[in-house]
């Protein structure tokens, strides 16, 4: 099956965040950005994406307004709150950013 190629416009790029894991003591870093699907529709979809570890460099050189082709995985995690309610959290982990300008 051929991979679907969708182009996005970069809307916002947040700064790199970093720290040390309390659980493992390892250093971590991440960076988020917002991209909007380039489509001929009235309300295009936007997605919040996260780059982690050395992948934070993938967005270096990309500016707000640039057109990019992205590779990312979307993952939902379910968890129980203290009162027993099931909640869900979604992560969109980006692993490819290709500048198309």
Describe each model-derived feature in a short phrase.
Residues 1-101:
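Single-stranded nucleic acid-binding surfaces, predominantly the OB-fold ssDNA-binding core
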């Amino acid at each position: 099956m051929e991979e679907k190629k969708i182009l996005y416009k970069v809307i916002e790029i947040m700064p790199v965040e970093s720290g040390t894991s309390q659980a493992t003591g390892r250093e971590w870093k991440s960076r988020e950005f917002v991209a909007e699907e380039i489509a001929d529709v009235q309300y295009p979809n936007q997605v919040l994406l996260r780059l982690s570890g050395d992948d934070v460099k993938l967005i270096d050189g990309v500016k707000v307004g640039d057109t990019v082709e992205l590779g990312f995985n979307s993952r939902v995690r379910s968890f129980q709150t203290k009162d027993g309610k099931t909640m869900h959290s979604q992560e969109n982990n980006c692993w490819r950013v290709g500048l198309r300008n």
